[in-house]
Amino acid sequence: MKQKYTCLLYRTKTTEQKDQAEMERQRGVCLQFAQEQGWLPIREFWCSEEDGRPINEDPLLELRAGAEQAQFQILLVSEFDRIGRVPVECSAAAAFFERHGVEVWTVTDGYMGKLVRLEVETMK
């Protein structure tokens, strides 16, 4: 079996979650899940909506570029809403990765591909 390269994304969405403990929680569950699946984490991305970075420095832009270049096969987050700032952004981002051959997985719900395809179809 070919080993799957995996990128891990950790994101805090509110000031309550901004603390280091929340990021470490996400990191811990993602690393454990990746290990259980036999995936090789190659990159970790940390993002806080309150960190003051311009939107064009969002880790999703770098992740998208990596997907376009087929640098990894799995994007893993702790929960689906960590992919974007609002639900429609989460679905659009996940659909982008799926179109570029990257499977989107969450620790809480597993493989999100089928759900993403359903949501994209209903948005048309």
Region annotations inferred by a language model:
Residues M1-K124:
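Short, structured surface patches at the beginning of a domain
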